[in-house]
Amino acid sequence: WYGSLTAAQLTGDRELENRLIRKFEPLLTTETNRISPEAHVDFRVFGVVPLEIYLLTRDPKYLELGLSFADRQWAKTTPDGITTEARYWIDDMFMITALQVQAYRATGEAKYINRAALTMTAYLDRLQQPNGLFYHAPDSPYFWGRGNGWVAAGMTELLRSLPEDHPQRARIMAGYHKMMAALLQYQGADGLWRQLIDHPESWPETSSTGMFAFAMVTGVKHGWLEADTYGAAARKAWLGLVQHLDSRANIDNVCEGTGKGHSVQYYLDRKRNTGDLHGQAPILWTASALLR
């Protein structure tokens, strides 16, 4: 939904933009029960959608709803100031960050970007490995493709909005650079990265590739990454991804929803879906990054 809204806005497709906003309306009125109240990062991240609609419409009802997700996430914190919803799974590096960054974009209030930066640095310290990639969790020492994609996309969204003089920007940028450099050596000849990034025998996975492409395109456009090297890698990824789209723009080879695993085989045996939203969204994010 977020990717569709940004793509519609960047292409000037007002009809699509309005249709997407209209589809949200029942969630404010007759279908409020479809919004989960559960205190879990995977449900909280939905708040990015009403916040994006607010940025497009300036209607305060969307701001109120979106901020309710961001503020409830910080209702309880650990002694170091991080939400107690943090699990130290790499997925969180997008789920938590994207919501708090979007709240900052909508309000300009520093507390939201500070939450995102604090969380990101804590996760970088705990999960990034010497090779630049990220374990799925401290007790799951595997470089899962989409999980690392969540990290790449989360850092990218944060760096897009994090003030240049923010005290944690240098640390986050260093983690981003280290990861981007690591990814270069694992990209397949087909342009895609693998289900387990460091296992070339594992299958090419599209949702991770879409997120890495998004991170690299954005990095090149903002001057964070060297254009010739990373632009070429991003282009190779994009051309590889479009080969996996069917006639209805459904992308295949998308890893199913995956909790942390405890063996290589667990990841290799995950089901590969077509049209799964985990894969559709990064295509839209990358398209949006190319248009910005």
Locations of regions flagged by a protein language model:
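Active-site lining segments of carbohydrate-active enzymes
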Residues: 83-87, 94-110, 118, 122-126, ...
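Inter-helical turn/loop segments and adjacent helix faces that build the functional surface
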Residues: 11, 103-114, 158-170, 219-226
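Short linear capping/connector segments at secondary-structure termini
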Residues: 134-140, 192-200
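Long, well-ordered core segments of solenoidal/helical folds
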Residues: 15-36, 61-83, 110-133, 173-192, ...
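CBM-like carbohydrate-recognition segments
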Residues: 7-22, 26, 30, 35-47, ...
